[in-house]
Amino acid sequence: MNYDPQEFKALTFHDAVAKFADGSDTPRAYLERCLAAAAEREPVVKAFVTLNEETARAAADASSQRWKASAPLSAIDGMPVGIKDLLETKEMPTQMGCEAYIGNFPKNDNSAVWALRQAGAVIFGKTVTAELGGNHPGPTTNPFDPERTPGGSSSGSAAAVAAGMMPAAIGSQVGGSIIRPAGFCGNFALKPTQGGIHRGERQATSMSTHGPHAGSIEDMWQVAIEIASRAGGDPGRTGLMGPMTTPSPVKPERLIVLETKGWAKLDDASRSAFEQLLDNLQRAGVKLLRRADHS
């Protein structure tokens, strides 16, 4: 299958809130569009472990009433969000891609999930993870080619966003489990500094970091900052800080280009696309420092 960036259009949420405010759209209607997309694409993409449709509809109805009353809880009030199945959710099982945890219902939400609910987000479902966040992948496919991997371990979160099933999802990372599937699926994603978003529960002593996948950079930032502003950072750590809207971009003065071992194996199309990116950066006035680093 050839890659077609037009096959799926990533959903955005930040541009829907004006319609919520003027009554021309509602969070419930937005959710129904997400559910319809999931019903159509999930049989192939296999991004979800659990979909909690009725609970999501109830949350979307409550959000619709808040927007109607001009009293949204936040800029993401009504946003459908998926949760990687490593993070605890009290009304859905947290099974971590592992048979030993089938039917495991935690008593509490993970701190990030709690913060999302406090902000009015609609918890859409639990997304597939590699077993225990490790190397054994789940059934999720890449939305642009079902024969290819979406990357892991936040595979379901990345694939669901890329397939246009929802505008954002939460992933977690130790080695590359947020940014790798985001790259494979073409999403925006943020891996904050460790401890920048409070992890809570059983992950409090792990090396993991929680962060969002999203179809737009605006939604990516908004989800991250809304969580951090409520849950804070880990004890003893400075939480993620910044404006409540997307920060203004800053052009870097210089960037280092590292040609690692994978560079020699890169296919011609990928190499050409990367070189074009470098050329665009140079034309924009960014100084590039190139080196080969095979250590």
Model-derived features with residue positions:
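An N-terminal boundary/leader segment
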Residues: 1-57, 283-285
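Acyltransferase
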Residues: 27-32, 61, 268-293
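Short glycine/serine-rich loop segments
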Residues: 108-227
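Conserved hydrophobic/aromatic pocket- or pore-lining residues that grip, position, or stack substrates
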Residues: 56, 78, 84, 116, ...
